[in-house]
Amino acid sequence: MIGNNKKMTIQEIIHGPKVTSMKEAMSRGEWHSGCSWCKRLEETTGTSGRTVRYASPETLAAIDADMNFFKLEHLVVNWSNLCNLTCVYCNDQTSTAWQSVKKIPINYVKNEHEDLIELARTQGHNIQGLSLGGGEPLLQKGLDVFLSHLNPATVSVMVTTNLSMEITTNPIYQILKTWPTVEWMVSFDNANKEKFEYVRDRAIWEQFVKNIRQMKQDGQQVNAHPAYSIYCALDLEEYYDFCVSENLGIYWCELNHPMELDIRRHSQTLRDLAVEEINRVIDKYGDRRSLAIDVLKTYRNTLQDNSYLKYQENFKSSETLAWHIEIENTLKKTNKFVELWPTLAKEIQ
């Protein structure tokens, strides 16, 4: 953490000692400990938020001339943990729906909105790239005010959403669908109704598909944004078939926790099956663009050699079933992991 914006202003954080130490490490061409997530992503997928964001030559020259130069060109905003779903691999820290299930008093973990809105007011004209996360960004109150300080003509927006709500009446979607450059990253891991609703608890498959088709009808750029895990590793062909049929791009993300869900930690038998599934997808769609085939090839390498994994000695595959039983009891699920993923369940017993 580089600063707590409940105790410091954003300006104090930007010019504080931790950000300064990160800048100094970057100027030496070194990875700072605070950049470990980007480092891991680049090692496993070849790309990260750091590599996909563009800095103008003028900005780079100004940074070279003065390490403390500040111009806000790219901004990632996780407005709050307000969310309507209880996804099985989420928790009560990042989803208010999970807080409700666990009967924890609702505690919105949020940025200081007025401070962010002031930042947008003073720097909004410079912003070229904006990433919106959550909780669920389409449910965030006050986000419309923040957006009003930006110039839709000059900013590229990326929104990560579970797309489970009715979007035709959603105020944030109604604003952003009119902006010229918005990329929607839709978080889902399965293209099967029962498996989708198991993982994305409280979401309805039919509403989800309806929303995707509405977005396409509205001329939006829509990507599937799955997390590579045991839930999709043996169903990749089905997933890719769905994405191709709906004309979706694919942008993979990492899922490393809980460890039980990382397919690369499981047995050689399961990893071999996952490799076979990747090979089927590559054979079928290897010549298609925007389907992240290169990432699948990287995943294949990590399945074949998982020696890079940390804390593997602490991993017990057999605990995966117990983990799911606990989740199923907590969420009062009628569908069961062992019934939906029988091959996985049989191998990890």
Where are these regions (language model features)?
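Conserved C-terminal portion of the radical SAM core fold
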Residues: 156-158, 179-185, 204-348
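Core AdoMet radical
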Residues: 72-82, 93-112, 125-140, 152-168, ...
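A short acidic, amphipathic alpha-helical/loop segment
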Residues: 119, 142-149, 169-175, 198, ...
